[in-house]
Amino acid sequence: NLFYSISDIERVGDHAENLVESVEYMKDRGIDLTESGIEDIRQIGAAAVKSFDHAVRARQYNSMDEVRKVGQYEDEVDNLEEEFREKHVERLSNGECNASSGMVFMDIISNLERVSDHAYNLAGYIKDEM
């Protein structure tokens, strides 16, 4: 399980790198997100970070309570991703944003959701060891 844990942690690093590349892409091309889109990213990002933080704590303290928290945050992130994709389609339909900013927005929330998925995997390995 430790080998799989290391692999998931490495994948989280890959997603973090993807997030940096998305921001650099926006900066280089002068792409801006709507305030609503930025707030959506803040919200899903905070939940994804919490899921990973609880996965680290679950490993550190061998805590089933922390494992459960990872699951709760992972569910929240999944729900937020679905909600924010729908909101994004509405913003596109209303002309509030364009295809370029929309592509970056979708990439960002997808990468954040994958961080949460890997946190959930980590929690699962810990649960299996208990």
Positions of PLM-derived features:
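Cytosolic, long alpha-helical scaffolding segments
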Residues: N1-M130
